[in-house]
Structure formats: C-alpha cells, structure tokens
C-alpha cells in the first residue's frame, strides 16, 4: 500500500487540529485550506523536479551606439559662429593648457614622416603670449608654403611687404626666423654660422674670421672661452644680405634708385600714350633704357657694407686697437725698434737686451756683424768673442738656403777643430 502524499498528510493534521479546537468559522477554515493546498502544490512541484520551472524573462538588448567622432571631425563640422568653443578662434593656433601661451602649428603634407611612417608632419612655429601674433605667424608660414591663394586668418594685403622678403630666402631659414621672433624661443644651438654660444653666461657671440688681417675678431661684448667659432660669418650661407643692409647706402645711391623707378614709370606712360588704338597691343619693355642713358651699377651686399661709414669707422678703430696692443706688448717685453740702414731690403732690426748681451734680430735677412774682430777666444765662455757669433749670422746680401746652412755648419766645425784647446777638452 502506497504511503499518502505530503498534501494528504497535511490535510489530516489540519482536520485533527480543527476537531480538537471544537470547530470554528467556516469561512476562515476555507481560506486556510486554500492556502495549504497552494503550499502542497508548490511542494509537489519542487519534489517532482526543478527542471520544469520557467527561467526569468531577460531584458531587451539595447541597440549598439554609433561611433564617436574625433575632435577634428567635430571642429570641422562646427559652424563659424561656434568656433569659439576651441582653445583659439584663429586657424592653426592652439592654447597650451599648462603655460597659457598660444602655439602656432602648420601641417606639411608634402613630406614623409619616418617616425610615424605616414605622410605629412606637424611644423612648430613657436609659442606667443599674444593670440594674434601666433595667428600672424601661421599666416606667414602658410603663405611661404602654399602661396597667396591659401586660406589664412587675416587679409593677404596685410602681408604685402612680407611676401617680397620671403621670396629671397629658403623655406627652412624663414621658419627659423619665425621661431626666433616667438615669446618662448629656446636657447639651443645656433642655426646660423658665426654665432657660438658661451658656456659661462649663455650668450651668443658674433665673430668674424680672417678680417682685416686678424685671425679672430669678436663683434660682441664677450669673448668666447676657447677663441674658436662655428665658421666664417655669412660666407657659406647662401643668403642675399642686400635687402637687409640697403639702408646703409649713401643718400645719393638711394636717390638714384628712386629716380630709376620714376624713369621706368615715365617710359611706360610715354609708350602707352604714343600707341594708337587700331594697332594691336604690345607689352612695353620694362626697365630697358636706351643706349644714351648710362647703365645702373648693381651693388652687392659686400659693396654696400664696405662703402658705409660704419664699416670705415669700425676698421679704423680695429687698426688703432691692434697698434696699441702691439706697442704695449713691446714695451712689456723690453724691446726698442731702431731703424736699419738701407741695404736693398725692406727689413727692420730689433735689439733685445738679454743678460747684458746685444743680440740683433731681423725678420727676413740677417745683417752681418760690424763689430771689430778681436782674438779673445775663451773656451770657458766663448760668447764674448765676436768670432763665435759670425758662424751663426749670415751677411745681408747672401740668401739663406740649405747649402748655406750646411757650409756654415762645416765652417764652425773647422774653427772648433783648429782650436788648440779642442784636443785638451
């Protein structure tokens, strides 16, 4: 016989409890029975197996979000009125969040970036305290790279003078000049030759080599430690300095340039007025003068510099300074310059007092000793005998050659061997 289920056993217990209690309200009894049946049904379900329970419903999967666009794409999609949300309102200018300066950058697409293995690189144009100065630096660099047709911050008419100047130098040199005008120019190695940096005070020293007969000449207030420089100033750099020092020209030369431009203008007007309307138009010959007019002389930068008053005064001061230094050195060393009789050679003799002895020295030819020869040979101290010195000093008319030196040495050996005291020594 099968054992009763858990629901039947629970019902029997409830009936027994109700009988013991002496009955009760029928409604309450019915509600209790319904609850117990529900509990029994749940117990049977658990006992029958948990695999019959339905899983809880899942949340609906949300749709994937769209790809977030980059900062450059957002800025490019902004209208002109919303451009103030960027760090700067100008093109090619960004504000550094740490230093607060405005940096100008340029993207050069014509080069290949080997570090990142892609086309194009960012060109740094310097950091500026003023936002407008950084924007103008970007405009100048963009005009140098892409010409007057590119998009810039300010009108092209503001850079009419700069467009003429930037055509005379290379792109690399022009970018260096822009960086040097920035507010945060780094004191690193110099870009140009002739500007060595001093290690003790971090200053630049403009030097010229082989100028006016001097091996080294400093144009700055401080002299370098080792007296060397990076190279000759401006000789190996292909930069036209004529436009930089044109204001050093005399007034007459400036007036001639102005008159030349006026002559060209008058010539154009005369040609245009003489032409008839029926004739086909021809371009006038600009700047071509007739044979009667003298041709203008083209002056280079060196010519302008050599003709200027500043260069002449500079050369005079340097010559005077070198003479004073030479005279002071001679006075310190105890030298006196004395003239020498004319012997057919342009020489100067210098008498130097060394331990009471008179030694005569000449830079090119050595005159003969005119002292009276005396036979006062002393083997202990031969320097008092003039014959001892005649073996070393040649006559003024005899050129110095290798054969002469060999002959003089041989004569000295003969004198030494003929000495009666030579064998005793």
From Swiss-Prot:
Modified residues (Phosphothreonine): 338, 343, 347
Sequence segments annotated as region (Disordered): 43-65
Subcellular location: Nucleus; Cytoplasm
GO annotations of cellular component type: cytoplasm; nucleus
DNA-binding region: 89-155
GO aspect biological process, one term: auxin-activated signaling pathway
Induction record: Induced by auxin. Induced by brassinosteroid (at protein level), but repressed by brassinosteroid at mRNA level probably via a negative regulatory feedback loop.
Tissue: Expressed in the apical region of leaf blades, young leaf sheaths, a broad area below the shoot apical mersistem (SAM) and near the tip of primordial leaves. In developing roots, expressed at the tip of seminal roots and lateral root tips. Expressed in developing nodes and basal region of internodes. In flowers, expressed in lemma, palea and anthers.
The protein's name in its UniProt record: AP2-like ethylene-responsive transcription factor SMOS1
Gene: SMOS1
């Amino acid at each position: 016989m099968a054992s009763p289920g858990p629901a039947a056993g629970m019902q029997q217990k409830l009936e027994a409890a109700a009988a013991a209690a002496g009955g009760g309200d029928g409604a309450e009894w019915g509600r209790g029975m319904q609850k117990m049946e529900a509990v029994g049904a749940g117990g049977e379900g658990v006992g029958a197996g948990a695999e019959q329970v339905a899983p809880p419903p899942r949340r609906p999967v949300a749709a994937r979000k769209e790809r977030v666009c980059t900062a450059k794409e957002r800025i490019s999609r902004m209208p002109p009125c919303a451009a103030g949300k960027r760090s700067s309102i100008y093109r090619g200018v960004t504000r550094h969040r740490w230093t607060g300066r405005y940096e100008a950058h340029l993207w050069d697409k014509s080069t290949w970036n080997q570090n990142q293995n892609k086309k194009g690189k960012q060109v740094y144009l310097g950091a500026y305290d003023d936002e407008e100065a950084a924007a103008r630096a970007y405009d100048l660099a963009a005009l140098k790279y892409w010409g007057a047709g590119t998009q810039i911050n300010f009108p092209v008419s503001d850079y009419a003078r700069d467009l003429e100047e930037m055509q005379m130098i290379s792109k690399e040199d022009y970018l260096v000049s822009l960086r040097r005008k920035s507010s945060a120019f780094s004191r690193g190695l110099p870009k140009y030759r002739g500007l060595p940096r001093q290690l003790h005070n971090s200053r630049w020293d403009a030097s010229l080599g082989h100028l006016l007969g001097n091996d080294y000449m400093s144009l700055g207030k401080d002299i370098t430690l080792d007296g060397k420089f990076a190279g000759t100033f401006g000789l190996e750099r292909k930069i036209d300095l004529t436009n930089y020092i044109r204001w050093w020209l005399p007034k007459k030369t400036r007036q001639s340039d102005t008159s030349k431009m006026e002559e060209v203008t008058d010539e154009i007007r005369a040609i245009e007025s003489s032409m008839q309307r029926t004739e086909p138009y021809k371009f006038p010959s600009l700047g071509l003068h007739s044979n009667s007019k003298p041709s203008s002389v083209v002056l280079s930068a060196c010519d302008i510099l050599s003709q200027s008053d500043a260069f002449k005064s500079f050369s005079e001061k340097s010559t005077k300074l070198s003479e004073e230094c030479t005279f002071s050195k001679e006075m310190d060393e105890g030298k006196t310059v004395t003239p020498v009789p004319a012997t057919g050679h342009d020489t100067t003799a210098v008498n130097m007092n060394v331990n009471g002895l008179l030694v005569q020295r000449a830079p090119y030819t050595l005159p003969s000793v005119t002292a009276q020869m005396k036979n006062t040979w002393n083997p202990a101290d031969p320097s008092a005998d003039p014959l001892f010195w005649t073996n070393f000093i040649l006559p003024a008319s005899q050129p110095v050659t290798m054969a002469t030196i060999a002959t003089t040495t041989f004569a000295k050996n003969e004198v030494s061997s003929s000495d009666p005291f030579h064998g005793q020594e």
